[in-house]
Structure formats: C-alpha cells, structure tokens
Amino acid sequence: KFLIQDFIPGDDNYMHILTCYVDQDSKVRFMSFGHTILEDHGDAAIGNPVAIINQVDREVMDKSIRFLEETGYTGFANFDIKYDERDGKYRYFEINTRLGRSNFYITGSGFNAVKWIVDDLIYHKEFDDEIVIADNENLYTVVPKSIVLAYCGTPELKEQVQRLYREGKVSNPIDYKGERNIIHKLYVKYFMH
C-alpha cells in the first residue's frame, strides 16, 4: 500500500507544531501552537524543530479540538502542520501520540506540559471547562542565534526573533544556568551564543 500526498511548497518557515493534552474523558485541556523557524536537517533527527516561536491560531486550534474530541482521543497529541501559501490553509501531516522532541518550547513559554497528564491520571483532578493555551510569546531554540537569524524566511520574522532576544524571551534547554560541568558550560558559551 502507498500513501500519496500532495507536495506542499515552502521551507521550514512554513512548518508549525501543535501540542495538546486530551484528558481521559476526551476533552482537550491544554494547547500550545508554535511557528517553526528551522528544523534539524541531520540524518539522525531530520524534521525535528530546532527553533520555534509560540503563537496562537484559534482556527487551527478549534479544528484540532473538534478532531480530537469527536474521535474520542486521549493523551498527548503532537501535530506537524504546514502552511500552504497557495490557498492560505494549514495542512496536517501527522499526529504523534506523545510529546515531541522539541516540547521544551512549551516550558519556555511558562507552561508545564507534563502537569496535565499527572493531574489527570494520577491525581484525578477536576479541570476547569476553559482550555489552557500557552500564549506567552517565546523563542525556543537549540541552535546558535546566528543560525536562527540566518534561516528567518522574512524580514518580519527576523525582526521578531531579534526582538525576542532583546527582551530575553528565549529558552534553550542546552543553556541551563545551573549546569556545573565546566565542559558543558564552555560548549554552551562558545557554540550556542
């Protein structure tokens, strides 16, 4: 069997990520939407985002809520989505039933993705009816600033990235301030800045 898929034009800047948590009653409780700036192009991790900016897109989120709740889905859902400039619509490529490799983009925006599954399955907490949306603008990256800036597809995106750096709204899980290993600290200092 083969799956034939339309080629959606555009580089990494057209990619987006949506991470959701759906409780055991199939109600979406948490959502985080991100605009991918750059993906990994190495053989071992191809396609994994290495730079993401949190955003909110209610249309994408509402469609995803309907899909997840109407299908009886539970657990984490991590969507790979690409914007199609030909018609201005988003195309869903896949859904992963786990947190993505780059889920620190959620943490960097001030939210704890794991909290939802723990509260749901371990503590059996009652959730508010309102869906929590990770709406704090933040740049997640695991590559040097110069690389992120080099791959911004538009002047507007480049300015947004520069502004986030100026405002200190950048999260990099490799650049951990509490790190005590001198080799790791030197690596971060010389290769990540």
Locate each region found by the language model.
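Glycine-biased flexible loop/turn sites that connect beta-strands or occur in inter-domain linkers
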Residues: 26, 87-88
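A short glycine-rich, hydrophobically flanked beta-strand micro-motif that places a catalytic Asp/Glu
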Residues: 5-6, 74-86
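A sequence-level detector of short linear motifs
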Residues: 30, 91-92, 128
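Short secondary-structure junctions
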Residues: 1, 71-74
